[in-house]
Amino acid sequence: GISFILINLKQPKIDIKPIKLLSGQSPFCQVFFDDVIASESHRIADENDGWKVAKRLLEFERTMMADMGSEGAVDIEPIETFKTSDALSAPGQLNLLTKIKKHEMRNHLIDLTMTRTQIESKNGFSPAALSLKYISTEETQARWELNVASLGAGGLENVENSSGIKKEIAKSFFYSKAYTIAGGSSEVQLNIISKHILGLPS
């Protein structure tokens, strides 16, 4: 079975190496253990009940991801990028503007759904809550894709040497790729929805 144990990362023989992402940030690390000693007194819950603890922990992470918060992210709406960009042709602008408006409508629906689930959760279980992580993180990725598209064909060109809004959009675009993995991938979320909302077999 799997047990959940807390370990002091400051003890000897633990080597932590940050992983630099496309965004330039390093929120994830590789952790190497070389004959590290873990105390049984630091075990959470009973032996072999670690998966239960891990699943409960992931629920909190999914709630955080559903709220579309991310450390170091900037608040740039695609429509604002669109208005200040002159890199698009007239036909392209109309097509992109349509996509942006559809994104804004979906985002508004997500906000309404979050409010509804908060109210429902006070009275018990809210089925819609299980879908929030999936729909909100997918839409957040779409948001940054639209921001990049609004910059035109050279939106991601020479990002390393760029500055200002272009650099911030590029960083957030790359970082957003983690949203549909952290807290349970989109594929895992769809399995949860199919089992607990639709009642389909595992």
Feature-to-residue mapping (PLM):
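A short beta-strand->alpha-helix segment at the C-terminal rim
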Residues: 1, 5-9
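Glycine-rich beta->alpha junctions and the first turn(s) of the following alpha-helix
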Residues: 4, 13-109, 179
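Structural signal for hydrophobic packing residues in well-ordered secondary-structure cores
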Residues: 9, 37-40, 62, 83-86, ...
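Short, glycine-/Ser/Thr-/acidic-enriched flexible segments
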Residues: 10-12, 21, 37-38, 136, ...
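Glycine-rich phosphate/cofactor-binding loops in nucleotide/flavin-utilizing enzymes
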Residues: 53-60, 65-71, 75-77, 151-202
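C-terminal helix-coil-helix/basic helical segment that borders enzyme active sites and/or dimer interfaces
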Residues: 91, 108-162
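Hydrophobic packing residues in well-ordered alpha-helices of helical domains and bundles
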Residues: 97-100, 129-133, 169
